[in-house]
């Protein structure tokens, strides 16, 4: 009779719920064996569910594949709402039918998994472009226009250049066919890939700024208006990376000028 350890090793090789190996092993009454069978079945079901989820997020890409297009870039941005730091956009071209386990809208990925999935995108993408527009430009042109500039910069870095753009809720004035998708980072794997690249890139930048400008908790809040950030603004004032067109930074700058 096989040991439970041997059965556990055998079960790792089983990839289908209908496998005859399960039927054979289920005759073994040992509780340890039954526990390992249940565990392996749950793992297989989880893999099937994940594959279905990833398939559903390729629906836009597959429609474009049918048209003979393969160089499809997903575009997304991070950092529209913060009081400090740049807006960062990423453009990512994934290989045809590429599925990266765990890839999703970056807001839905556990923080501890960000770097792992970011690295998987880096490893598998055909091309990645990143656009970074700083707070000074944001203050000059407004955040919406700055976001478009960041996206255009990211796209310009792609090589090869894309045949079609899938963009999260935006249209760009570019001579490339494009589809604007509401909640694109949750509905397109290409956009989700851009989402995690932009997110990790910006988070790392804000960690660097945290070293330069201590007291605002940038490493944790990424420039968003948390209690610690607002406390830092009140005590220490405005830094060179703050967006002076955003409240309450704007009022602090005006108050300083008037005093």
UniProtKB/Swiss-Prot annotation:
Cofactor dependence = Mn(2+); Mg(2+)
The entry lists its GO molecular-function terms as: manganese ion binding; RNA binding; RNA-DNA hybrid ribonuclease activity
Task: Give the UniProt subcellular location, in the record's own words.
Answer: Cytoplasm
Q: Where is this protein chiefly located?
A: cytoplasm
Mention any one GO cellular component term assigned to this protein in its UniProt record: cytoplasm
User: Binding residues for a divalent metal cation, per the UniProt record?
Assistant: 76-77, 168
Superkingdom of the source species = Bacteria
UniProt xrefs under SUPFAM superfamilies: Ribonuclease H-like
The record ties this protein, via Gene3D superfamilies, to:
Ribonuclease H-like superfamily/Ribonuclease H
| Alphabetized UniProt keyword annotations | Cytoplasm, Endonuclease, Hydrolase, Manganese, Metal-binding, Nuclease
One Gene Ontology term of the biological-process aspect is: mismatch repair
Keyword ATP-binding part of the UniProt annotation? no
Supply the EC number(s).
3.1.26.4
What this protein is reported to do is described as: Endonuclease that specifically degrades the RNA of RNA-DNA hybrids.
What PANTHER family does UniProt report for this protein, alphabetically?
RIBONUCLEASE H2 SUBUNIT A, RIBONUCLEASE HII
Protein name (record): Ribonuclease HII
Q: Where does this protein come from, organism-wise?
A: Streptococcus pneumoniae (strain P1031)
Which gene codes for it?
A: rnhB
